[in-house]
């Protein structure tokens, strides 16, 4: 009957007895007169339960599942709203028999079979009627473990089912198998069978029966357990029962067998045994070595597997010389593989551990002989000589083992001594063996891929290690770690070396000599390429490795090293690494493996550990070029600038990579596959992405740029692109034979609309004027029409138009002029032989607009790139409007060019005396100086006075507020030639002083010679003052901006008497010390005096543009 029915050992959930109420849910249901029938715990438990209650057979659960899927597809409008994602994909997943289902399927089954579902969820809690369709018939289920459904029947169902089951089995055996079962049933004790059955299959909430789990644990080796008859015979209950125990249960009218659940439980146990055998490595093959124990409490003996059968297999016991079919097998320990029978061998202990004899500790006779160690690899993967290892003589194996163990004892006793050559060989052999064991079971492709990943990780850790996290190791600690690492190789030595004595030893000697020569030539900066690892074979001596490689080389090194630097610890000699050594790459180049760029804004330190981001203190650049020696970095989470006295520390928090050449955005502009500069691609307007660039390098650059810009919204893109571009130019200059490329266009804003239709920038549209781009030869480039999206980056609100006192109308008049004569021919002299790389434009432009954004502080040291002010920064004024006549000049080489010294060489008051009484003022022009502080001084003062001048213009004089550009160019030609290289002009502050008082204006106007003298002398004096201020600021350790942060409470002198023209309005209630707000500009108080008695000409607190003008010079 066992073969016919196919029912394995198991039990029931029925019968009388206290064991079946072991779970609270069963006890609760029994009180209600209900019985829970267990269902197979897989993805089809719901369909199994419905199939039995509706179709009276669990075997039809697949049919119920497919019918449910069909019903869901036919009534898609009813259920699609409750499905996340694609409805068709959901139905496709439901076709998998292991896919779990839920409320949607229950609702569909209720409508399909016209039955309401009642589910018991928790003990002592009323059931839930999940479907309320008012069907007369009900389906009772028990929900447990969050995803499993069992069947709930009235308790009478179990009693009647047990009686029917016994009658069915009795008819089957008597009529079909011709077996008289009446006498057999009478001989059995019904209650005993019932109790045993209940104890075997008493299911709990967490898993199946406990006794079955225990039986499976005892049967994990794949041996067949005793049958029911044998168990009964051993217990003495019966001596001649021809039927199995489960058949006897089926014949018992008081016991109900849950046949479906027993079949699933048996298959589950078989699968668990297979999984356990695979996981534990207990799948033996013919020829494998193992250990057997013939008796229950006997010793484990070494054996070889001679044959594999379905469950049990014969093994050859070496120590007994006989074949046995054993049930208790285990894998041999590593130290027992070189143990063979001999007269001097000490017998192993009962625990299976082998001990060395007394001879093992006497020391080796010849320590220079090569040592062949046993293998840690599985038996079938090692060299064929490992199978014949037991054929060695006892003297040979014993001498080898004692040499090996004694040498390792000597190593542990003297850890500070230099390790001898044989020991070093064993260290490398062990490293090779451990590496091979890590790749066990992988294909060659997977092995190479894993090795490449490990090499990349090790290289990244060597380059970016942290001195403080891993301090430098002393010589004794290095040697001690090396000796400790070499100890385990006593047990896990590779057996790839053959066992032949004569020829093998000669070959080992030659290999050792070759290896010693290799180690003699190995240097600190040698690094094996990833391709080298692919060529590593069984030759253990071809790999330069480290004893502590498994710990990822924790020896420290400087933060900036050569990209190809690699620390070789093949010879564990004393290794001292100074934490103060700073290596600078002679030729900047990308490392062999560039570490992955983490997602912003996480900042990674040298060891790859994410560090907290300082609030408003993250800077995206580290050095201005490859010539800077950068030491170990320290993150400063405080937004207040710290002291810069420490020369060996970077002034800013570290970016994601320690070098500009490792930045994903390097070199700051897109390059094609050939490495040439690529043209900025057009915008992608297709949703499918068909118009995206085909070049992956261009796509990668703009993707990284977009991620960076999105992750750092308070940083203008050129703030981190400019240092990369400068680093690229510095790298190009390091090669004198390579011509430095000249890019006439702006490095980043190439596609900006250079000169659009004048109607786009007039005052009617309230648009700020666009900037044009100037080439290096002084000629204007052809205007390029950009996308209409960026034609108006910022619109001035109407409130600002009324407050600007004719500023926009004056701007419109300036825009109507022809910009073709902006640049004079004299510019060619200043540009020749100097920096041919135009710096990024700053100010109102199509991408950034007139309101720049950046954190409201300035770094300790200015790196030369434009640093913009924040909109809420009190030192930031965003109301400077540049006319279209001068907008092309800002893109010239700002490092060597002073535009204001040409564009404003002669003031409008000197040129047009007749307009002096009409309060004609010249528009302030953005000034750029060859010195950073001088440029800031002139620009700040010019901006402040420009606000004063514009505020005092009467509306009637708006139409006469500018001279023609041709006249300006003609006046420039009157400047003496000897002053051309100097290019210093009269400060705009002095121009404004002349205009301030109309009564004394005639006295202020001086001849051309005096004007030239003042132009030559005055900027030099201001420059000397600024140099002293900068030196004092640097010695104090704080930037000037730090002392000027008022956070929106101060009002500027340029704003006295009228409201601001942009941004946020400042509070004037706290500024009573400044005097009456209605004080006239002509009543004096032109400058406040500083502590030295000099006016605040160079003080950035008076600046109208704040930090913005710092971007005009390098």
From Swiss-Prot:
A GO term for molecular function: cysteine-type deubiquitinase activity
Ways its activity is controlled: Phosphorylation on Ser-202 and Ser-204 induces 'Lys-63'-specific deubiquitinase activity.
One Pfam family named in its UniProt record: OTU
Composition bias type Basic and acidic residues, residue spans: 420-435, 496-529, 913-922, 969-1000, 1067-1086, 1096-1114
Primary localization class, coarse: cytoplasm
Localization of this protein: Cytoplasm; Nucleus
Compositional bias annotation for Low complexity: 392-404, 474-487
Enzyme superclass (EC): hydrolase
Domain OTU: 34-155
Residues with the Phosphotyrosine modification: 120, 439, 460
Protein name per Swiss-Prot or TrEMBL: OTU domain-containing protein 4
Organism: Homo sapiens
Taxonomic lineage from the root: Eukaryota, Metazoa, Chordata, Craniata, Vertebrata
Gene it is expressed from: OTUD4
């Amino acid at each position: 009957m066992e073969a016919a029915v196919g029912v394995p050992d198991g039990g029931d959930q029925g019968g009388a007895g206290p064991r079946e109420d072991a779970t609270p849910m069963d006890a609760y249901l029994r009180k209600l007169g209900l019985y829970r029938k267990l269902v197979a715990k897989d993805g089809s438990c719901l369909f199994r339960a419905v199939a039995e209650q509706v179709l009276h057979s669990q075997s039809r659960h697949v049919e119920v599942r497919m019918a449910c899927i069909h019903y869901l597809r036919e009534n898609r409008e009813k259920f699609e709203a409750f499905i996340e994602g694609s409805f068709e994909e959901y139905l496709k997943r439901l076709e998998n028999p292991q896919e779990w289902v839920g409320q949607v399927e229950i609702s569909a089954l209720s409508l399909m079979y016209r039955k309401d579902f009642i589910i018991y969820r928790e003990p002592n809690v009323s059931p839930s009627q999940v479907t309320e369709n008012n069907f007369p018939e009900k389906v009772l289920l028990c929900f447990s473990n969050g995803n499993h459904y069992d069947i709930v029947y009235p308790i009478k169902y179990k009693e009647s089912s047990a009686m029917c089951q016994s009658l069915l089995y009795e008819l089957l055996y008597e009529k079909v198998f011709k077996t008289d079962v009446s006498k057999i049933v009478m001989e059995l004790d019904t209650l005993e069978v019932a109790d045993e059955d209940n104890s075997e299959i008493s299911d709990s909430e967490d898993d199946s029966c406990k006794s079955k789990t225990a039986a499976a644990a005892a049967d994990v080796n794949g041996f067949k357990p005793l049958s029911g008859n044998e168990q009964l015979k051993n217990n003495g209950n019966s001596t001649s029962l021809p039927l199995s125990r489960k058949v006897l249960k089926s014949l018992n009218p008081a016991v109900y067998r849950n046949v479906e659940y027993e079949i699933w439980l048996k298959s589950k146990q078989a699968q668990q045994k297979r999984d356990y055998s695979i996981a534990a490595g207990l799948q033996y093959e013919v020829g494998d070595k193992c250990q057997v124990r013939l008796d229950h409490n006997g010793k484990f003996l070494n054996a070889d597997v001679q044959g594999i059968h379905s469950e049990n297999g014969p093994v050859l016991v070496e120590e007994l010389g006989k074949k046995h079919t054993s049930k208790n097998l285990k894998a041999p320990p590593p130290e027992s593989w070189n143990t063979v029978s001999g007269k001097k061998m000490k017998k192993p202990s009962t625990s299976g551990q082998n001990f060395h004899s007394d001879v093992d500790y006497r020391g080796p006779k010849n320590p220079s002989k090569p040592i062949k160690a046993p293998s840690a690899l599985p038996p079938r993967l090692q060299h064929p000589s490992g199978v014949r290892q037991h054929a060695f003589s006892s003297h040979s194996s014993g001498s080898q083992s004692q040499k090996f163990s004694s040498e390792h004892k000597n190593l542990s006793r003297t850890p500070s001594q230099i390790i001898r050559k044989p020991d070093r060989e064993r260290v490398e052999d062990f490293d090779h063996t451990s590496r091979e064991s890590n790749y066990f079971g992988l294909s060659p492709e997977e092995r190479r891929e894993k090795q490449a990943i490990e090499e990349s990780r090790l290289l990244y850790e060597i380059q970016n290690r942290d001195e403080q996290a891993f301090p430098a190791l002393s010589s004794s600690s290095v040697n001690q770690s090396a000796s400790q690492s070499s100890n385990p190789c006593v047990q896990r030595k590779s057996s790839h070396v053959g066992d032949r004595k004569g020829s093998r030893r000669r070959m080992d000697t030659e290999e050792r000599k070759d290896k010693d020569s290799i180690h003699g030539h190995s240097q600190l900066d040698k690094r094996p390429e990833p391709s080298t690892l692919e060529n590593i074979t069984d030759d253990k001596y071809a790999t330069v490795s480290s004893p502590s490689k498994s710990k990822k080389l924790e020896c420290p090194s400087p933060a900036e090293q050569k990209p190809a630097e690699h620390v070789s610890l093949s010879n564990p000699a004393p290794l001292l690494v100074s934490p103060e050594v700073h290596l600078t790459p002679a030729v900047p180049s990308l490392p062999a493996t560039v570490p992955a760029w983490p997602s912003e804004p996480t900042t990674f330190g040298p060891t790859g550990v994410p560090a907290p981001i300082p609030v408003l203190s993250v800077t995206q650049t580290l050095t201005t070029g490859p010539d800077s020696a950068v030491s170990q970095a320290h993150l400063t989470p405080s937004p207040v600038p710290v002291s810069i006295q420490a020369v060996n520390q970077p002034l800013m928090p570290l970016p994601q990579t320690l070098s500009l050449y490792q930045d994903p955005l390097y070199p700051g502009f897109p390059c094609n596959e050939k490495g040439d500069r690529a043209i900025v691609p057009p915008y992608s307007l297709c949703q499918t992405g068909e118009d995206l660039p085909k070049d992956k390098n261009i796509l990668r650059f703009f993707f990284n740029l977009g991620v960076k810009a999105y992750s750092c919204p308070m940083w203008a893109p050129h703030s981190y692109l400019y240092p990369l571009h400068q680093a690229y130019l510095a790298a190009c200059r390091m090669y004198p034979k390579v011509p430095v490329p000249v890019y006439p266009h702006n490095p980043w804003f190439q596609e900006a609309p250079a000169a659009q239709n004048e109607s786009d920038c007039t005052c009617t549209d309230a648009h700020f004027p666009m900037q044009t781009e100037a080439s290096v030869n002084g000629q204007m480039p052809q205007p390029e029409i950009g996308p209409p999206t960026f034609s108006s980056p910022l619109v001035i609100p109407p409130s600002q138009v009324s407050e600007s006192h004719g500023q926009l109308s004056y701007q419109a008049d300036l825009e109507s002029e022809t910009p073709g004569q902006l640049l004079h021919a004299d510019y060619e002299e200043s540009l020749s032989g100097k920096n041919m790389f135009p710096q990024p434009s700053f100010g109102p432009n199509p991408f950034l607009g007139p309101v720049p954004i950046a954190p409201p502080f300035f770094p300790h040291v200015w790196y030369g790139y434009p640093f913009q002010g924040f909109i809420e920064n009190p030192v930031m004024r965003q109301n400077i409007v540049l006319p279209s006549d001068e907008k092309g000049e800002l893109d010239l080489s700002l490092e060597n060019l002073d535009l204001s010294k040409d564009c404003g060489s002669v003031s409008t008051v000197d040129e047009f005396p007749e307009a002096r009484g009409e309060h004609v003022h010249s528009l302030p022009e953005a000034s750029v100086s060859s010195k950073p502080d001088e440029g800031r001084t002139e620009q700040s003062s010019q901006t402040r006075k420009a606000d004063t001048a514009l505020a005092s213009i009467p509306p009637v004089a708006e139409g006469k507020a500018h001279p023609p550009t041709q006249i300006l160019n003609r006046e420039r030609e009157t400047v003496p030639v000897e002053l051309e290289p100097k290019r210093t002009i009269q400060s705009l502050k002095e121009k404004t002083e002349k205009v301030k008082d109309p009564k004394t204006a005639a006295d202020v106007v001086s001849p051309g010679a005096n004007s030239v003298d003042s132009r030559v002398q005055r900027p030099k004096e201001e420059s000397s003052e600024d140099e002293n201020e900068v030196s004092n600021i640097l010695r104090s350790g704080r930037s000037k901006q730090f002392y000027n942060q008022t956070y929106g409470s101060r009002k500027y002198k340029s704003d006295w008497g009228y409201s601001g023209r942009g941004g946020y309005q400042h509070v004037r209630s706290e500024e009573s010390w400044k005097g009456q707000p209605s004080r006239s500009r002509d009543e004096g108080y032109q400058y406040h005096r500083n502590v030295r008695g000099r006016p605040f000409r160079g003080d950035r607190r008076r600046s109208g543009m704040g930090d913005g003008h710092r971007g005009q010079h390098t």
